Amino acid sequence: MVRDEIEALVARERPGWRVADVVEVNDESGPTFEVAVERGDERRTLLVSADERIVGERR
């Protein structure tokens, strides 16, 4: 999964939000991505799985 794919996922699943940063995290379950997204003054972190699903969100 590359940044372009993550940006497309965020655009589809979280309209109005933009990707600010992407960090790849590898653990025993395989690669996942911590994705910082922004909308105005709001900022959140999404956890995205390698199979292109948002599996968690932190405010």
Where are these regions (language model features)?
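Short, non-transmembrane alpha-helical segments in secretory-pathway proteins
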Residues: M1-E24
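Hydrophobic aliphatic residue packing
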Residues: I6, V10, V35-V37, V48
